[in-house]
Amino acid sequence: MGGMNDLSSTPAPEGDRPARQRKPDWIRVKAPVSKGYHETRKLMRELNLNTVCEEAACPNIGECWTKKHATVMILGDVCTRACAFCNVKTGMPRIVDPMEPENTAIAAAKMGLQHIVITSVDRDDLPDGGAGQFVKVIEALRRETPDTTIEILTPDFRGKMRAAVEAICEAGPDVYNHNLETVPRLYPTIRPGARYYASLRLLEEVKSHDPMIFTKSGIMLGLGEQRLEVHQVMDDMRSADVDFITMGQYLQPTPKHAKVEDFVTPKAFDAFGAIARAKGFLQVASSPLTRSSYHAGDDFAEMRAAREAKLAKERERAQG
């Protein structure tokens, strides 16, 4: 946990800034300038909604917002934790906005979204960790845009996990995402406020409560992890029956965040993706610019089709 009065996105003083690595050509993206980008930004401002696209300085924001895709970040824009990789502000959060669920549904309707991703900051200050707000958002979306599929990306609800997962699963999201973020060895420095095996248990709990909810998890590469450690994370996810794995390049948001140890090549990402598919994931996204919600709608459609094909084969064998 960071100091409650510090903001994690505040730059370090000039003299304290270490040299930053130059990004390779495959990691560079165009600056966002399109009409669609500005329309999406304007709508989010009008509805007083936060997006992880902006708060986490996502490199894909130009592409996604041009297509009017956005990941809404609920429960405010201040996190109660201070992970070494994350650009979201940390400190004492504000009161939860009661209009957030309705405004999220309005945004989804105005943007004509077929698939929406909802995430949040950590809210260790709330009795339920913020689970109730996830439920309200899902319910508002079901009322206002019943044909929109819903993907949620939640924190670990430390100390409140079981009740939180049960409440959210009862609300019926289509995809439940919770990121492991990195390999277990790096948790003390990269994700000190969380526990690797607690996050795995959360993913298991989702499947235990409702096996038909797709589960998804992701890790960042380039933080100093070893190849075999990544393979082990894949195995751990499959043991928890995770359907979809995402793997992307870690990018240092500011000089005070964890440094990039390695820029993993596109070829290496392809190799990790092939290994993940061989391990039985229904869906795999593995590339330098892959992020949790990047192409989420298309990926969901492919994952659903893959499960339907798998179930059809199982029925054929059972009848055979």
Swiss-Prot record:
Its cofactor is [4Fe-4S] cluster. Binds 2 [4Fe-4S] clusters per subunit. One cluster is coordinated with 3 cysteines and an exchangeable S-adenosyl-L-methionine. Pathway: Protein modification; protein lipoylation via endogenous pathway; protein N(6)-(lipoyl)lysine from octanoyl-[acyl-carrier-protein]: step 2/2. The keyword Iron applies. Residues 1-24 are annotated as: Disordered. It holds the Pfam family Radical_SAM. GO terms for cellular component: cytoplasm. One of its GO terms (molecular function) is metal ion binding. Keywords: 4Fe-4S, Cytoplasm, Iron, Iron-sulfur, Metal-binding, S-adenosyl-L-methionine, Transferase. [4Fe-4S] cluster 2 binds at residues 79, 83, 86. PROSITE patterns: RADICAL_SAM. It is found in: Cytoplasm. Residues 65-282 form the Radical SAM core domain. It catalyses: [[Fe-S] cluster scaffold protein carrying a second [4Fe-4S](2+) cluster] + N(6)-octanoyl-L-lysyl-[protein] + 2 oxidized [2Fe-2S]-[ferredoxin] + 2 S-adenosyl-L-methionine + 4 H(+) = [[Fe-S] cluster scaffold protein] + N(6)-[(R)-dihydrolipoyl]-L-lysyl-[protein] + 4 Fe(3+) + 2 hydrogen sulfide + 2 5'-deoxyadenosine + 2 L-methionine + 2 reduced [2Fe-2S]-[ferredoxin]. Residues 1-11 have a biased composition (Polar residues). [4Fe-4S] cluster 1 binds at residues 53, 58, 64, 293. The keyword Electron transport does not apply. It is an enzyme of class 2 (transferase). Residues 14-24 have a biased composition (Basic and acidic residues). Belongs to the radical SAM superfamily. Lipoyl synthase family. This is Lipoyl synthase. It comes from Erythrobacter litoralis (strain HTCC2594). The gene is lipA.
